[in-house]
Amino acid sequence: MARLNLFYLFVTLLLSISLRPCYGLPEKTTSALFIFGDSTADPGNNNYINTTAGMRADWKPYGQNGFFEAPTGRFSDGRVFVDFIAEYAKLPIIPPFYQPSADLTNGVNFASGGAGVLPQTNQGLVVDLQTQLRSFEEVQKSLTEKLGEAEAKALLSEAVYFISVASNDYLAGYLDNPKMQEYFVPEVYVGMVLYEKGARKFGFLNMSPLGCMPLMRARNPKSSEGGCFEAASGLALAHNNALNVVLTSLEQLLKGFKYCNFKFYTWLYDRINNPASYGFKEGVNACYGTGPYGGVYSCGGKRMPMEFQLCDNADNYIWWDSYHPTERIHEQIAKTLWKDGPSVGPYKLEDLFFNKERLTIADILDAPNEEHFQH
């Protein structure tokens, strides 16, 4: 019963701004992009909030590859995958929500490094998903004031909504909190993690093999043997299985619901174990960090330990630091999401941005309400 209630709560939240398909608005070749998530997609929102060094990345060696003039707050040696997606969609780089005077008409990036779905994940240090969703409502109001109601609703209905979040709920929540382990079996915990608002077209980055991060290898009781921390990876697999079930159900419940779900676990696991096959030299150790596998997160010397090692060429590495991949992996993620059929489905992101299906304002206003799903 708890799992069923969580599922319907997810559906209700989705339907709160869910939009239904039809065919009447003028054709437009590019949709706006709205991004919700964590450090995998954060463009620098954490620069603007009161947080700790561990939740920021606006100093070197972050951003060292020179694409940006200075470190931006991205947890990478350069760009993150949503920057590439914007490029492929013929959009400018999507601005952080907290960036002053940002142009909102091409979309907004709400992602915050360290964030989770659950408010207690890194509480007080990040912008959790529920707060990100409230910020989206502010953007809706702002766009309506700027563009007028009809044009704003048309823009939002055509937009693609990308969600990359949940790792921190496990890394900073479930694994480190015995009470969470007691009260939440993985499937129920996953249900709590799947709270979302959105529209009709979604992109999802499902969970990576968490136990293979340099951080988790270093925490593995058998770290001397070099293996992944299977307890963490098992949670990721449970999450991905639950996500697949929920998305399949939503596709049946919501007419016109379309999504791109990236099988990130197997995709990244293959690169970690076979780096040379994908143009890398190192799949286990981080380019930047200290301790076993570079798994101790030093924040560029901003917190203990102050010392860290930095590789000569991040392009040879899968892992940039103890948590995060390099820009080169981010670029491969984006290319896969955009065009690669075997690892994504049932749609590619390119399909979601450039399909010819249109929405009418009448159908937007006539979206189903939550009472249809009361149980």
Question: Where do the model's predicted regions map?
Answer:
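Conserved active-site regions of diverse hydrolases
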Residues: 2-375
